[in-house]
Amino acid sequence: MASQFELSVVSAEKEIFNGNVVSVRVTGIDGELGVYAGHTPLLTSIKPGMVKYTLEDGKEEFIYVSGGFLEVQPTIVTVLADVAIRGEELDQQRILAAKRKAEDTLSKSNNAELSAKLSREIAKLRVYEIVNSKLANRR
């Protein structure tokens, strides 16, 4: 019998999962984290991605999280996320449509945003050069 611990995955709206597991994997800000019973206490930010947990019978389940926090305590691991969706509830067509929309928006706005930022920085540089040349002429 594998050692188990309680896992709680909570979104801003509801508790997505609460039960006993033998392991959980998430992507922290510094890389992949694997948590097993007896893990050292930990509090860290997690990146958007997958929470993968293994039940005592060996069955693996998956939850998408939009990022958030992972807290590891001696007997319970808690994942707090703004958005958490069970893997089986994800809709591929909706995801692909949202991905395409985001890519289109990024490609349209990215160039304009970069151009505007570059223009602002060039303008700052010009002001800096003018101010410094006038100060140099006063000396």
From Swiss-Prot:
TM ranges: none
What's the short name of a Pfam family annotated to this entry? ATP-synt_DE_N
List the subcellular locations.
Answer: Cell inner membrane
| Any one GO CC term of the record | proton-transporting ATP synthase complex
Q: Which CDD domains match?
A: F1-ATPase_delta
Keywords on this record?
ATP synthesis, Cell inner membrane, Cell membrane, CF(1), Hydrogen ion transport, Ion transport, Membrane, Transport
- Write down the superkingdom of origin: Bacteria
- Quaternary structure annotation from Swiss-Prot or TrEMBL: F-type ATPases have 2 components, CF(1) - the catalytic core - and CF(0) - the membrane proton channel. CF(1) has five subunits: alpha(3), beta(3), gamma(1), delta(1), epsilon(1). CF(0) has three main subunits: a, b and c.
Recorded family membership: Belongs to the ATPase epsilon chain family.
What function does the entry list? Produces ATP from ADP in the presence of a proton gradient across the membrane.
Protein name, as recorded: ATP synthase epsilon chain
Q: Which organism is it from?
A: Actinobacillus pleuropneumoniae serotype 3 (strain JL03)
What does the record give as the organism's lineage? Bacteria, Pseudomonadati, Pseudomonadota, Gammaproteobacteria, Pasteurellales
